Amino acid sequence: MNLHEAITEWKDTPESHARFNDVFAAKVNEDPKLKDYRDWIERNIFGFGERSFIWMWKLLIDELPKDFKFLEIGVFRGQILGAVRMLAPKADITGITPLTSEGGHWESDYKADIKLLHDTFNLEQPKIIKGLSTDKEVIELAGKESYDIVYIDGGHTYEIAKSDVWVYSSFVKVGGYLVIDDCCHKYDLPSGQFKGIEEVSKAVDELLPNGFYKELFSIVHVRVFIRIK
């Protein structure tokens, strides 16, 4: 399944949501490198989300130039930054993170965690903007660039989620992708699939889609939008 097929075939039904998750996860497991990566993430608790999400990233990355720019808000221990680097060795990859337990995570040396993950898989280290996504200095620094993909998985309160979508969606290039985690309460997911965080879903639904963004598809609790103008 390529991106065009995913967009065409997506439906908001329990059966469709279950199929997408199963097909995407199977694709990851068919690729030894991606399977080993996700297995390591799960074994060492270096990230959450679904195995299927890695294939979502591959579908988006396949549509972009090799040196595309990627920004993640909310890095945790680096799972997504590492996956994107594995799929796109020449990409320009940046993460925004306070490198602390902010948001309810356990205490850890998050800078060392991110380095360990990338070293383990012989991946080039990402650029890190240290701070909160709502910090003026962080916004100014991140806003010096425009990005082919912005991934929002930061603070899970209504206020922070709405701020992140409002601010960072403006940094996406026309034709680029805005990907948001934990925001699928409006969808008819099958029993057992996590819809995300209700406050995050509310914030996203109030802002998207709009005249600048069209929704393409979702996978479990992640939604994918494309900037159209």
Q: Which residue ranges define each predicted feature?
A:
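S-adenosylmethionine/decaboxylated-SAM
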Residues: 3-10, 24-48, 54-229
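Long, compositionally biased, charged low-complexity segments
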Residues: 10, 14-20
